[in-house]
Amino acid sequence: MELSYQTLKFTHQAREACEMRTEARRKNLLILISHYLTQEGYIDTANALEQETKLGLRRFEVCDNIDLETILMEYESYYFVKFQKYPKIVKKSSDTAENNLPQRSRGKTRRMMNDSCQNLPKINQQRPRSKTTAGKTGDTKSLNKEHPNQEVVDNTRLESANFGLHISRIRKDSGEENAHPRRGQIIDFQGLLTDAIKGATSELALNTFDHNPDPSERLLKPLSAFIGMNSEMRELAAVVSRDIYLHNPNIKWNDIIGLDAAKQLVKEAVVYPIRYPQLFTGILSPWKGLLLYGPPGTGKTLLAKAVATECKTTFFNISASTIVSKWRGDSEKLVRVLFELARYHAPSTIFLDELESVMSQRGTASGGEHEGSLRMKTELLVQMDGLARSEDLVFVLAASNLPWELDCAMLRRLEKRILVDLPSREARQAMIYHWLPPVSKSRALELHTELEYSVLSQETEGYSGSDIKLVCREAAMRPVRKIFDALENHQSESSDLPRIQLDIVTTADFLDVLTHTKPSAKNLAQRYSDWQREFESV
């Protein structure tokens, strides 16, 4: 099949609209069930459902004239009109209690088939029959004579299946009756597909909870459906599930100044494989591991927050305290459960911050490394090898301030290693302008600045992004300190205080702050550059 830009774009849009519709349907079902349980008095069951879904079902309420019983009654009426009998909803189970668990994979397949292949209404053919079908028509008439009741039932079903759709043939002139049929008019399938996708997306936006859904409203798969694990493993899975990031950091790609190479590689590994899976097959399979290294405060964690905001994946924010346990054997079990959960909730992203605290070099400790630490590192390496050999959409994003302390085996599994260096002059100028614009309002306060941004960008060479933010905060804080002095020194209660007027922040004030605020990692810049020349992979 030949690929084109149009095909890829429309395929992605159609798949995204279908996923949105499926997600909204699942949420609506859970809210309907919770509402029905509450109305019928099953309060404990409703509370257990809300606790397991972690969706906050009580924040939503069912619309007027909508409930689960009404929907079931309408389905029964529709089924009776179509098939002249009521549907059989449940049946008595013949299996034992141990085999009563639902077959999730088969049910999921059936739901997918129903979603993708919806039944179309039957249309009565009113075209003139061809000569080749004359014999078949005669046979049908003879059969109808033998079974007249069957013909009535079939006609009734056809009429009830039309759903108000009437089809009539186009009348032709008498001179054109014997002429060859003309080709039909050209149908703009591209326009039809675009309109259908736009209509489905807008309808979902109106019927769902929000136009920009919050990650906290994302419906996660229940741990009870985590097949293949015993009770101990499920307890560990509950521990790891607490680190699934469900809050919206509200960090967009455009909020990150610079880091263009890092943002592009993250999109190649996380965003594009989900949008355009046709392009990422074979040798073009997406990256499974990405290491961001550089001085502190340059935006490594900020980039991970952008991934949690922009990418529609399950985000695991993992630190050393998550996978390190004092109990023997629990650390490697936690690592295994982490990757199993990531596959279960795929597509997902595992963010390992301060990686050197977990994966330092083996065999370099003078007194010998602890056995439990070695087992945990080995399990982490084995699990990452499993990711590289599988087609699961699981991506490992790691950040480190000390890349020279990482184990060589871990570096091999992190396919892309990007230096997040100190910001350039243009980036520093943009940061200063962002934090100290000419006029900035913060509720009741209005701060004015008169800064030469080009001069300040030269003077802040060697400062990281967090250092520049700290300098800007200190420069803005100096006029505010004068307000504190006026408020504290005012003794007379009869006289009113004057209107608050902040002094203008000038270039001299900013330069004075620079003399008292030094960069945090200027001396390590050369060491990062040397390590980059030896281990870079972009």
UniProtKB/Swiss-Prot annotation:
UniProt keyword annotation of Transferase present: no
PROSITE patterns linked: LISH
A GO CC term assigned to this protein in UniProt: katanin complex
Cystine residue pairs: none
Residue ranges with Polar residues bias: 115-135
Annotated keywords: ATP-binding, Cytoplasm, Cytoskeleton, Isomerase, Microtubule, Nucleotide-binding
Leading EC class: isomerase
GO terms, molecular function: ATP binding; ATP hydrolysis activity; microtubule binding; microtubule severing ATPase activity
Location of this chain's protein in the cell: Cytoplasm, Cytoskeleton; Cytoplasm; Cytoplasm, Cytoskeleton, Spindle; Cytoplasm, Cytoskeleton, Spindle pole
Region feature Disordered, mapped onto this chain: 94-147
Compositionally biased region (Basic and acidic residues): 138-147
Binding site for ATP: G294, P295, P296, G297, T298, G299, K300, T301
Catalysed transformations (reactions): n ATP + n H2O + a microtubule = n ADP + n phosphate + (n+1) alpha/beta tubulin heterodimers
Swiss-Prot/TrEMBL GO biological process terms: cytoplasmic microtubule organization; microtubule severing
Matching InterPro entries: AAA+_ATPase (IPR003593), AAA_lid_3 (IPR041569), ATPase_AAA_core (IPR003959), Katanin_p60_AL2 (IPR027497), LisH (IPR006594), MT-severing_AAA_ATPase (IPR050304), P-loop_NTPase (IPR027417)
One matching Pfam family: AAA
UniProt domain LisH: residue ranges: 25-57
The protein's Enzyme Commission number: 5.6.1.1
Domain of life: Eukaryota
PANTHER family per UniProt: AAA DOMAIN-CONTAINING, KATANIN P60 ATPASE-CONTAINING SUBUNIT A-LIKE 2
Record's function text: Severs microtubules in vitro in an ATP-dependent manner. This activity may promote rapid reorganization of cellular microtubule arrays.
Record family assignment: Belongs to the AAA ATPase family. Katanin p60 subunit A1 subfamily. A-like 2 sub-subfamily.
Protein name, entry field: Katanin p60 ATPase-containing subunit A-like 2
Organism: Homo sapiens (Human)
Gene that this sequence comes from: KATNAL2
